[in-house]
Regions:
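Helix-to-loop junction immediately C-terminal to a conserved catalytic motif
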Residues: 57
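Conserved ABC transporter NBD signature motif
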Residues: 65-73
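ABC ATPase NBD coupling module
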Residues: 74-90, 193, 235-236
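Short coil-to-helix segment of the ABC ATPase nucleotide-binding domain corresponding to the Q-loop/switch region
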Residues: 102-109
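Conserved ABC ATPase signature
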Residues: 142-146, 150
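A short, proline-enriched helix->beta-strand linker immediately N-terminal to the Walker B motif
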Residues: 161-165
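Catalytic Walker B motif of ABC-type/P-loop ATPase nucleotide-binding domains
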Residues: 167-170
Length: 257
C-alpha cells in the first residue's frame, strides 16, 4: 500500500550505469525524488554528481538503466519529446552558461522563446522571475557587468522560468563567498517552499549540515547512503520560511531510506 504521507515522485532513476572508455562513472544508481523535496547530492570530485544531473536532464545517455520524469521514460524517449520534458526540469549549470552578448532580460527570456511563447507572455513571466530573484532593476545589464552572486541569480531565474517540477543545481554556490552563498541558498529554499523539488549537488558540508532535509552520498559512482533528516524549525525561521505542514521540527539523525 502506498504511504499517504509519501510525496508524489517527480523523478525516478533506476539501475543507472555510465562508463567513459574503461572508467565507470555511475554504477547501478537508484534514486527517487518526491514533489517538494530538497535533496543534497554530496560526494567528492569525480563521484559522478554532475554526470547524474546531466542524465536526469537528458543531456547525456546512460549505458544501462533509465530515468523516468512523469510519463517520460529515457529508454523510450523520442528526440522531439526532449524539449517538452525539459519544460518540467530546470537546471543551473556549474558555470552559469550565460550569454554575454545579451542582457539579463534576454538571457532569461530565451528559455521561453525556444518553446514558442508569445512576446506578451514572455515579458510578463520574465518580469515575475526577475522580481522573484531580486534582479528586475538589472534587466538591461549584461552578465559580464554583474557580480558572481548576481550572475547566479540570473541562472536561477532562467532555470525556473518554465515553472519546473524539479530544479537541478550543480554546485550553485561553488565560487561564491559565504554571505552570497547564504543568500543563494535562501532563494533556492524559497523556490522549494512553493512546491518545486530541488536536487542540489554540492561540496559545501556546512550548507548540508545546516539545511539538509535529505542527503544522498555518492562515492565512486554509487550511492553510499540516502539519509532523511527532520528539518529543524530554527533553520527555516533563519531564512524566513515557515515550517512545512506535517514536518517534524526535530532532527532525526540516522534515518535511512
Amino acid at each position: 500500500m502506498t504511504d499517504p504521507l509519501e510525496p508524489r515522485k517527480v523523478i525516478g532513476i533506476y539501475h543507472l550505469h555510465k562508463e567513459y572508455e574503461d572508467r565507470v562513472i555511475l554504477r547501478d544508481v537508484n534514486l527517487q525524488v518526491g514533489n517538494g523535496e530538497f535533496v543534497f547530492l554530496v560526494g567528492p570530485s569525480g563521484a559522478g554528481k554532475s554526470t547524474l544531473l546531466r542524465m536526469i536532464y537528458m543531456d547525456e545517455a546512460p549505458n544501462e538503466g533509465q530515468v523516468v520524469v512523469g510519463s517520460y521514460v529515457s529508454t523510450n524517449l523520442k528526440r522531439s519529446q526532449i524539449p517538452l520534458l525539459r519544460r518540467r526540469i530546470g537546471i543551473i549549470f556549474q558555470d552559469f552558461k550565460l550569454l554575454d552578448d545579451r542582457n539579463v532580460f534576454e538571457n532569461v527570456a530565451i528559455a521561453l522563446r525556444v518553446v514558442g511563447a508569445r512576446n506578451a507572455e514572455i515579458k510578463k513571466r520574465v518580469i515575475q522571475v526577475l522580481t522573484q530573484v531580486g534582479l528586475y532593476h538589472k534587466r538591461y545589464d549584461r552578465p559580464v557587468t554583474l557580480s558572481g552572486g548576481e550572475q547566479q541569480r540570473v541562472a536561477i531565474a532562467r532555470a525556473i522560468i518554465n515553472s519546473p517540477e524539479i530544479l537541478l543545481a550543480d554546485e550553485p554556490t561553488g565560487n561564491l563567498d559565504p554571505e552570497v552563498t547564504t543568500e543563494i541558498l535562501q532563494l533556492l529554499l524559497k523556490i522549494n517552499s512553493s512546491g518545486t523539488a530541488v536536487l542540489m549537488a554540492t561540496h559545501n558540508h556546512e550548507l548540508v549540515r545546516n539545511f539538509g532535509q535529505r542527503i544522498v552520498f555518492l562515492r565512486e559512482g554509487a550511492i553510499e547512503e540516502d539519509i532523511r533528516l527532520g528539518l529543524a524549525a530554527f533553520t527555516r525561521d533563519r531564512v524566513g520560511i515557515a515550517q512545512p505542514a506535517g514536518r517534524n521540527p526535530e532532527w532525526k539523525r540516522g534515518e535511512k531510506t
